[in-house]
Amino acid sequence: MHEMSLCEGIRGIVEDQARRHGFATVKVLRLEIGRFAGVEKAALGFAFDVVMRGSAAEGARLEILDLPGRALCYDCGEEAAIEDRFDPCPLCGGGRLMPVGGDEMRIKDMEVQ
């Protein structure tokens, strides 16, 4: 389950930010996760609760914000939202697409005290 290692990375970031900015507790942590990031959200939620024990984020509410998949169409030159990596261009029907968004995962923000 790679979600556990993702949460370990999040914990490291939280601990670093707590030292830098002097907060003791994270109340809410918001993650942006792209459609194509390959993250199982239920597993991430479980791993988050386990990995954050003993950290500033112990007991924090995890909010996940879904980011759409995006691709550049080489046929029409436009960028568009797509549901699946192998979808045709929703604008022109072309099949030559290069994904340009939706594979990211990042901390958007945290509510701290």
Swiss-Prot record:
<feature type="binding site">
    <location>
        <position position="76"/>
    </location>
    <ligand>
        <name>Zn(2+)</name>
    </ligand>
</feature>
<keyword id="KW-0862">Zinc</keyword>
<protein>
    <recommendedName>
        <fullName>Hydrogenase maturation factor HypA</fullName>
    </recommendedName>
</protein>
<dbReference type="InterPro" id="IPR020538">
    <property type="entry name" value="Hydgase_Ni_incorp_HypA/HybF_CS"/>
</dbReference>
<dbReference type="Pfam" id="PF01155">
    <property type="entry name" value="HypA"/>
</dbReference>
<comment type="similarity">
    <text>Belongs to the HypA/HybF family.</text>
</comment>
<feature type="binding site">
    <location>
        <position position="89"/>
    </location>
    <ligand>
        <name>Zn(2+)</name>
    </ligand>
</feature>
<feature type="binding site">
    <location>
        <position position="73"/>
    </location>
    <ligand>
        <name>Zn(2+)</name>
    </ligand>
</feature>
<dbReference type="GO" id="GO:0008270">
    <property type="term" value="F:zinc ion binding"/>
</dbReference>
<keyword id="KW-0533">Nickel</keyword>
<dbReference type="GO" id="GO:0036211">
    <property type="term" value="P:protein modification process"/>
</dbReference>
<keyword id="KW-0479">Metal-binding</keyword>
<comment type="function">
    <text>Involved in the maturation of [NiFe] hydrogenases. Required for nickel insertion into the metal center of the hydrogenase.</text>
</comment>
<feature type="binding site">
    <location>
        <position position="2"/>
    </location>
    <ligand>
        <name>Ni(2+)</name>
    </ligand>
</feature>
<feature type="binding site">
    <location>
        <position position="92"/>
    </location>
    <ligand>
        <name>Zn(2+)</name>
    </ligand>
</feature>
<dbReference type="GO" id="GO:0051604">
    <property type="term" value="P:protein maturation"/>
</dbReference>
<dbReference type="GO" id="GO:0016151">
    <property type="term" value="F:nickel cation binding"/>
</dbReference>
<dbReference type="InterPro" id="IPR000688">
    <property type="entry name" value="HypA/HybF"/>
</dbReference>
